[in-house]
Amino acid sequence: MKIFDVVVIGGGPAGCAMALDLNRRGYDVALCDQAKFPRDKVCGEFISPGADPILEWLGVLASIEALAPKRLKGVAISSYESAELEIDYPVSTETGLRPSSLSVPRYQLDALFLKQVQNAGVKVFEQHKVTDFIFDDDCVAGVHGWDENKTSFSLQAKLVVDAGGRNAVSLRKFNLKQEGNGKIAFSAHWQGVRLPDDYCYMHVSRPGYTGISSVGNGRANVVLVVDRSALDGKKAETLYHNVLMSNCRRCEMLQGAERVEPVRSVESLAFAVKPVPCGGLVLVGDAMGFIDPFTGEGIYLSLRSSQIAGEVIHAGFQNSNFSRKFLSVYNARRQEEFGDKFLLSRVLQWLIYNRPFCNGVMKRLSTNRV
């Protein structure tokens, strides 16, 4: 059986970025995903400006731009039906220019990413679901799973990277997930949404919040995040529409608009992950933990975590060392860089569900801009 240098589980932004990174460093990489691409995902489809340099380094930014994605100037926040406060991205200290963020449908982004991975020479196994690991002593040394024909397969590797998201096989195998705040997100694309300007519009009001942003071609992505308890036996589409239209600011934007696809949902938002208990295995992207989507940082954090992991994995190959202790450097670096963002996410959760404080902060921000 062929032994790859690295097997990557998951073909989302984190997994594709990881595969491209290691391929560019000269390693023999395989990537497995249980889906057939293109496929869709529940996502804000909003990529913060910090991702642009990473996408360019990976060689995919020009291809994304060719899709004619929407470029957003920042966010516009409404607190409990108040007028939106528009917040532009700050001017870059390096370029002196004000950056913008990409807004592009996930089914387009992920399909483009995977095509780039295939073109780079990575061996891609679509419709291959990884269900377990191969072990050599206390280190992961490959994967087992099933293909689309329910035929078992095995791939051996010197290292495995799990980019399988919030339901990653590593989280289940080693019981690593520490459940968070019980949030659930609903999303769908709409046609004809009336957005005043090129911002991601965030509306905070009970029982949750929404993010609305154009994704180009006359369509907008409308995401609702609420506590799981808000469902209370209701159908997802009923809850989604009722909550959207219960806010006068959203209602104005959605008046005359049409939902053009079924409402999708995803649970287990905002969770933490315990350390990996063995060597030969690295987790990247949402598999390493998921912060609340209100921050709009999810895809950037996935890309950046893969970039950090690539540096540590490269050092592991140079030292022929994939022990748990050696690879823990990645966890430390990730925490050092992202720790403040995770803290901010927790603070935001308290803020947006505390109406007087949320209104007070928005009023203070508005006053400071005058």
Language-model-detected regions and their locations in the chain:
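Short beta-strand to alpha-helix junction loop
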Residues: 93-115, 231-235
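C-terminal helical "tail/cap" subdomain of flavin- and related membrane-associated enzymes
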Residues: 314-370
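N-terminal Rossmann-fold NAD(P) dinucleotide-binding loop
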Residues: 15-16
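Glycine-rich FAD pyrophosphate-binding loop
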Residues: 23-43
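N-terminal FAD cofactor-binding segment of flavoenzymes
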Residues: 42-81
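Predominantly flavin-linked oxidoreductase catalytic cores and closely associated redox partners
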Residues: 116-254
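FAD/FMN-dependent oxidoreductases across multiple families
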Residues: 67, 232-313, 318
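Beta1/beta-strand and adjacent pyrophosphate-binding region of the FAD-binding site
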Residues: 1-12
